[in-house]
Amino acid sequence: MSRIGKKPVQVPAGITATVDGQKVTAKGPKGELFFVANDEISLKLENNAVVVTPVNQTKDARSKWGMSRTMIEGIFKGVKDGFERKLEINGVGYRASLQGKNLQLALGFSHDVLYEPPVGITIAVPKPTEIVVSGINKQQVGQVAAEIREYRGPEPYKGKGVKYADERIVRKEGKKK
């Protein structure tokens, strides 16, 4: 069993955190986020740290304990530094560009794909083959990156498509004559 939940979450400098029952709110230089914990988890603010404890020792409560602590740590990191996910595009004629705030992708379809990012997410295109998705909500940044990758995921024979920058594609050998 993981014991990550036992460690209190320190509130970083420059962030104000408040605990109101099951809700933790964090305000920082990048914005404001909140997390509502399950009823089986109790939250307390002690010595500039959020202490997460399960209400009872049921398996269900213990399973939500570490997750709640990690979520609180994530909102603190998000309002302080933010999160970003980098994507790379491989393939002849595959490229990305920005049209205002929308992302335009040429991925070998008969039409260009236009992706409108949700509120709170910023998309940057430093090169036509690179996309950087950034924001303060870790889950939302990952979701947007996954949606962009889904338009044309990397294929195993030539590696063409959209992939995460840190992703390794297992390549397959073509058929032999």
UniProtKB/Swiss-Prot annotation:
The keyword rRNA-binding applies. The keyword Nucleotide-binding does not apply. Keywords: Ribonucleoprotein, Ribosomal protein, RNA-binding, rRNA-binding. GO terms for molecular function: rRNA binding; structural constituent of ribosome. GO terms for biological process: cytoplasmic translation. It holds the Pfam family Ribosomal_L6. One of its GO terms (cellular component) is cytosolic large ribosomal subunit. SUPFAM superfamilies: Ribosomal protein L6. PROSITE patterns: RIBOSOMAL_L6_1. InterPro entries: Ribosomal_uL6-like, Ribosomal_uL6-like_a/b-dom_sf, Ribosomal_uL6_a/b-dom, Ribosomal_uL6_bac-type, Ribosomal_uL6_CS. Belongs to the universal ribosomal protein uL6 family. Part of the 50S ribosomal subunit. This protein binds to the 23S rRNA, and is important in its secondary structure. It is located near the subunit interface in the base of the L7/L12 stalk, and near the tRNA binding site of the peptidyltransferase center. This is Large ribosomal subunit protein uL6. The lineage of its organism: Bacteria, Pseudomonadati, Pseudomonadota, Alphaproteobacteria, Hyphomicrobiales.
